[in-house]
Every structure is written in C-alpha cells, then in structure tokens.
C-alpha cells in the first residue's frame, strides 16, 4: 500500500473514494464542510436522513455527490463530540481500514486530520491513521489455492492520499513510522497464521536469517549441540518429544552508539503446543499453532525498527521448539537443570513456555542489558483474568512497567499490570528441586511470572503475557500482530531519550 501526503480540498480530488469524518450531532469538520458547500447542502441533507449511525466507526457511502470529483464519499461517524478521544478515533480508523480493504476503489483520499484528537498531536494522528489503514488491508492466503470469483476482483485501496493543511518533515516521518509498524504487524501475523507443519523452529530461524540479510542485522542460530554446551537443560527438556530440531535465535540491531546498552526482547517460540505428556484437550488444539506469537512479535518488531532506522541497540532472543508427546518426551516429575544452574521439577509438561524462556533470560545476562522484556502466550489464566483486551504485564522494576503501560496507551496496544509479590513465590516450592514449574490452580499468571523472575536478578525485566491478545478465535480467527505496536512505541520512546 502506497501512502502520500498533500494539501488541497476534498471536492476537487479525482479519486475512487474520499473519506471524511462527522460527529453524531451533524457537526462537520473542514473537509466535510467543503464537500457540503460544493454540493450546495446536499451532503448535510443526506446525513440528516439518519442513515449514518451515531456510534463511532459507523459508515455511510454516498455515490456521485454533486460538486465532488470523486466517485464516492465515505462518511465515518466519530461518535458524540463531547465523548471524542482515543477510543472513538481508533474505532473510526478500524472501520475505515476494513472498508477500504474490501471496497472497489483502488485509490482513496482520507481527509481526517482536520479533527483534532484531544491530547494528541498531528504526528500521532497520522501514525495511527496509516497503521490502521495498512493493517486493515492485511489478508492471509499463503496456504490457500489461487483466489477465485468476485473476491479476487476487490483487492481494496492500493494508493492512499492523506489530505492535510500543511506538510512537515515530522508528519512525513510519522507516516513512515505507521507504515513500518504495520509491516511489522503483518510479519507477526503471517508467522502466527502459518500452520505448525509450515512454521517450524527451523522456519522461524530461516525467517530471522532472511530478515538479517534484508536489513543488515547480525543473526546467529544455535542448534541442539550449541544449547547443550551452554547447559540449556530446561529448554532442551521441552524439545525431547519432537522430531523437529529446536533452535535458539539471536538477533542484533545496532542503531545506537557502541557503548549504549541494548534493550533485549525475548520471544516464546513454541511452534506447536500439544501440551506434551500432559496432553491438552482436543477442542481448539489447532489454535496452539499461535503459541509462537511471542517469537513472531520479536521478529515483527525487528522489522519495524529496522524500517524506521531507530537510533537504539536491540537484541532479540527466540528459543523455539515444539512441545510434543513421545517416547523420549519429558515426563511429569522429571527434574532438569537450567542454564542458570537452578533445578526444576516439571510437574506439568504443558507449562513449557517458562521452561524455554528461563534459559533465554539467563542467556540475556551476557549483553548487560538496559532492560529485558519477554513476550509470551504463557497462561490461560491471563485470559481468564483480563480477557482479550489488554496484555498482562508483570515486572521487577516499577519504572519499566510504567514505561510499557504508557506506551501501550499511546499505541492503543494496551497492557495491565499484575503484582509480582514475594508471597507468591511460596507456591513454587518443590520437595525434589529448587522449584516446581507450576504453582497450583490459583494466580496462574502471577506464579508463571514469579518463576521467570528467578532468572532475572541481574537486570530490569518485564514480562508481557499475550495469551489473550495474540490471536482471536471464531469467524475472524487469526493472529493480531500484537504486541508489535506496543513494543515499537516503547523502542521509539527509548530511542528518543526515555530511561535506559
């Protein structure tokens, strides 16, 4: 999708569609008012019929509006004026993105920057706008045969003009950021949506290597022998039941000064999670291909920051394997030794994400990081606690947690913090090892993070549990690309002088 920015008036644009915003009380912004004037009041009269619902994101297509050079005007409701803010704006953008993706117009002009969003500047507005439209155009068909029928003829907008009052360098940079983040989300979605027989640990490694070649990133891929030499007994215990060889991916983005400490991102890469010997129920087990969405988000974020050329150093660590039953698989009751030297009693083989992450978190120490953020579809308990709106956030540093929460608000990819109190550590006690890998039926998200916290004593660390936000089920089943927007916003802020 190609985005350009220009000044001008909407009624003179010869394009397939012109998008304008209106409020529930009929109040028109500058662009909508210009269309109304050119149509001699016809535009307002059509809106006055009540066909456009008041709810933010409602749409009304008006064809052949008098006085306008475009084929159709797409009016989007911004909701009630006194309730207008981030949520209403995003609701409108999501609706526009979907409409443009499925519409017949190949070229579109979007005239929405004339409506200020309270507390937000024009750069934020443009970045969000571009990201939403580009993300709305996403479709996954890598595992389908060639498109047939009418849907193949409706490929949506390929060219989008953003109409503004002025053009500045910062506005153009905001557009580029929006595109970069959308591309990172698309990569994360592609990887998440691929089935487990396509997206194996080796496939993730090959994707990282290809990304490295494209953007001149240093990428290392460690195999089973390398991991054994490092003493990654916890990670390797998960891989024992699978015929797919495990991989440990190390990525380096060096956009900052050589002396700058890196931010380390760690992504859980279970490319299919059967539960192992502690086998999951069969219902919806197909969705366990999404258990590598933490890894996908790291790869997507690396693509985004490389496209933006952020002045920051970032290391990406991706431990990746399948979790399968088999004659050689780890059994409940087995005790393994992690890279840190701490021993773990594996009480449930379906609590495997923490077992691969803990060795990656130990490996992260060698980079003397400014901070470490791990991303994982870790616990069903997080979905029970928070639903599918925010990601769960736990951290051993309150300032780091606040950064991530704030960046979640700015990006719209929100998180919610849960406690990481010492009292919960008692639930991980084991009679046969330094710790068990589960803490019982209560506070599952917290005890999982408490387990990881035992491997993060050397640095500031935060954990994002994306079990509820990495994908959606039902008719719209598929990966969401989250939390790439949150991570990208966090790294943008860090590159501009935030703590660290």
From Swiss-Prot:
**What cellular-component terms does GO give this entry?**
cytoplasm
- Gene3D superfamilies xref list: Leucine Aminopeptidase, subunit E, domain 1, Zn peptidases
SUPFAM superfamilies, per the entry: Macro domain-like, Zn-dependent exopeptidases
Q: Which InterPro entries match?
A: Leucine_aapep/pepB, Macro_dom-like, Peptidase_M17_C, Peptidase_M17_leu_NH2_pept, Peptidase_M17_N
Keyword presence, Metal-binding: yes
Describe how the cofactor binds.
Binds 2 manganese ions per subunit.
The yes or no answer to whether the keyword Cytoplasm is present is yes
One of the record's GO molecular function terms: manganese ion binding
- Mind listing the UniProt keywords for this protein, alphabetically? Aminopeptidase, Cytoplasm, Hydrolase, Manganese, Metal-binding, Protease
Tell me where it resides: Cytoplasm
Q: Which Pfam families match?
A: Peptidase_M17, Peptidase_M17_N
EC number in record: 3.4.11.1, 3.4.11.10
Residues binding Mn(2+) 1, per UniProt: 273, 350, 352
Positions contributing to Mn(2+) 2 binding = 268, 273, 291, 352
Q: Which domain of life is it from?
A: Bacteria
What is the reaction catalyzed? Release of an N-terminal amino acid, Xaa-|-Yaa-, in which Xaa is preferably Leu, but may be other amino acids including Pro although not Arg or Lys, and Yaa may be Pro. Amino acid amides and methyl esters are also readily hydrolyzed, but rates on arylamides are exceedingly low; Release of an N-terminal amino acid, preferentially leucine, but not glutamic or aspartic acids
Q: Catalytic residues?
A: 280, 354
Instruction: Tell me the enzyme class.
Output: hydrolase
UniProt function note: Presumably involved in the processing and regular turnover of intracellular proteins. Catalyzes the removal of unsubstituted N-terminal amino acids from various peptides.
Q: Which family does it belong to?
A: Belongs to the peptidase M17 family.
- Protein name per UniProt: Probable cytosol aminopeptidase
Q: Which organism is it from?
A: Aromatoleum aromaticum (strain DSM 19018 / LMG 30748 / EbN1)
**Origin organism lineage:** Bacteria, Pseudomonadati, Pseudomonadota, Betaproteobacteria, Rhodocyclales
């Amino acid at each position: 999708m190609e985005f350009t920015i220009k000044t001008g008036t909407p009624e003179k644009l010869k394009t397939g569609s012109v998008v304008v915003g209106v409020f529930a009380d009929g109040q028109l912004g500058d662009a909508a008012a210009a269309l109304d004037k050119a149509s001699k009041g016809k535009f307002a009269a059509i809106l006055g019929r009540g066909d456009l619902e008041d709810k933010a994101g409602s749409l009304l297509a008006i064809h052949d509006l008098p006085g306008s050079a475009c084929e159709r005007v797409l009016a989007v409701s911004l909701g009630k004026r006194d309730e207008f803010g981030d949520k209403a704006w995003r609701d409108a953008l999501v609706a526009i993105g979907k409409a443009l993706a499925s519409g017949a117009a190949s070229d579109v002009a979007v005239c929405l920057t004339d409506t200020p969003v309270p507390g937000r500047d024009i750069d934020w507005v443009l970045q969000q706008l571009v990201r939403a439209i580009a993300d709305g155009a996403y479709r996954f068909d890598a595992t389908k045969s060639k498109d047939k029928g009418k849907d193949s003829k409706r490929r949506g907008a390929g060219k989008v003009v953003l109409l503004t009052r002025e053009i500045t360098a910062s506005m153009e940079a905001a557009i580029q950021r929006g595109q970069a983040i959308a591309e990172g989300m698309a990569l994360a979605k592609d990887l998440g949506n691929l089935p487990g027989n396509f997206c194996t640990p080796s496939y993730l490694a090959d994707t990282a290597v290809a990304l490295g070649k494209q953007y001149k990133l240093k990428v290392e891929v460690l195999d089973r022998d390398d991991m054994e030499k490092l003493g990654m007994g916890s990670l390797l215990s998960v891989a024992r039941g699978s015929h797919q060889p495990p991989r440990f991916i190390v990525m380096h983005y060096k956009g900052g000064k050589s002396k700058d400490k890196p931010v380390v991102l760690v992504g859980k890469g279970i490319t299919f999670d059967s539960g192992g010997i502690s086998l999951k129920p069969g219902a919806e087990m197909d969705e366990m291909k999404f258990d590598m969405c933490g890894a996908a988000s790291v790869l997507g974020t690396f693509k985004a920051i490389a496209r933006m050329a952020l002045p920051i150093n970032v290391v990406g660590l991706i431990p990746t394997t399948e979790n399968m039953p088999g004659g050689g698989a780890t059994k409940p009751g087995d005790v393994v030794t992690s890279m840190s030297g701490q021993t773990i009693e594996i009480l449930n083989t379906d609590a495997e994400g923490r077992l691969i992450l803990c060795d990656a978190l130990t490996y992260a120490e060698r980079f003397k990081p400014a901070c470490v953020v791990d991303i994982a579809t870790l616990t069903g308990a997080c979905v029970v606690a928070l639903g599918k709106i925010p990601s769960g956030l736990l951290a051993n540093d309150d300032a780091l947690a606040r950064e991530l929460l704030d960046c979640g608000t700015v990006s719209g990819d929100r998180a919610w913090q849960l406690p990481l109190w010492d009292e919960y550590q008692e639930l991980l006690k084991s009679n046969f090892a330094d710790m068990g890998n589960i803490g019982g039926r209560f506070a599952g998200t917290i005890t999982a993070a408490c387990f990881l916290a035992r491997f993060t004593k050397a640095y500031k660390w935060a954990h994002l549990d994306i079990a509820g936000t990495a994908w959606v089920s039902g008719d719209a089943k598929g990966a969401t690309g989250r939390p790439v927007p949150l991570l990208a916003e966090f790294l943008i802020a860090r590159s501009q002088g935030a703590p660290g």
